[in-house]
Regions:
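Residues lining hydrophobic/aromatic ligand-binding pockets adjacent to catalytic sites
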Residues: 1-265
Length: 265
């Protein structure tokens, strides 16, 4: 497995590949000691993983929030560990997506949005991902009601994306609802399902690259070219799969480098 160069930068002096400033890439987590030594240097302590991660990548998708909202002190620690150009995206709590299944959860959504507001105030908030369970079939009326929740509609509302994991959602009716509310369709690629490459939000796009085997350099170059076209009009957030092996993190670094090369060509 290829290894990253092992500089000793600080979070205030990032070595992130110089991709266009509106393209954010990373993985769905950072706290993996097993990423040593191929991603993290052997001498970096676990307390400094995020700080080092932010020298190589410019975003992370926080899955912790699927089960529990972060405390103020926890979020403050994360924010202080990364530079100003870094973005945190957060997966919506399962109480919203899996237990309530988007129904009667106005208070839960308000709590979720409030919990990540410090990241927004610091200019380090990416997007909020609502990942629906695989057995949640298309219900446009439920989605329409959910998108009308005040915490998602007011002028300071965060960017949002939806990952649908049942084919029935992939319809013009769904896309029209997302466009109306400036919500992104998360273009997710897994070993079982590929979301149509449709971009509904005016301001942002969402990608999740979840193949267990990772991606070849040639595939990453192709994705970089297509993502650059999407990024001409909006911010792009792209996250590779996290595993005990650092394949996803290394893929994300190569993706940012590939975007930089495409931009320079």
């Amino acid at each position: 497995m290829p290894r990253l160069p092992q500089p000793q930068p600080t979070a205030g002096d990032p070595a992130t590949p110089a991709a266009p400033p509106n393209i954010f890439a990373g993985t769905s987590g950072w706290a993996y000691a097993t990423w040593k030594p191929d991603f993290y240097p052997a001498d970096v302590s676990s307390k400094r993983f995020l700080e080092y991660y932010a020298t190589q990548l410019n975003s992370v998708e926080v899955n912790f929030t699927f089960r529990k909202l972060p405390t103020e002190s926890m979020l403050a620690g994360w924010l202080s560990a990364v530079p100003s150009g870094f973005r945190f995206s957060f997966k919506a709590p399962q109480r919203i997506t899996h237990f309530s299944r988007l129904r009667n959860c106005e208070g839960l959504v308000a709590d979720f949005v409030a919990s990540v507001r410090p990241a927004q105030q610091a200019g380090k908030l990416g997007l909020l991902l609502f990942q629906l369970p695989p057995n949640f079939k298309a219900a446009p009326h439920i989605l329409a009601d959910f998108l009308s929740i005040p915490a998602l509609k007011n002028p300071s509302a965060p960017k949002i994306a939806f990952e649908f994991r049942d084919q029935s959602w992939f319809s013009e009716e769904t896309y029209a609802l997302l466009r109306e509310h400036n919500a992104a369709l998360c273009v997710a690629e897994t070993d079982d399902l590929r979301t149509p490459d449709v971009h509904c939000a005016r301001t942002h796009a969402s990608f999740r690259m979840r193949r267990a085997c990772g991606y070849t350099p040639e595939e990453i170059t192709r994705y970089a070219s297509s993502v650059m076209a999407v990024a001409a009009a909006r911010e792009v957030y792209l996250y590779f799969k996290h595993e005990d092996e650092p394949t996803g993190a290394l893929n994300a670094v190569e993706f940012l480098r590939a975007c930089s090369k495409v931009a320079a060509s």
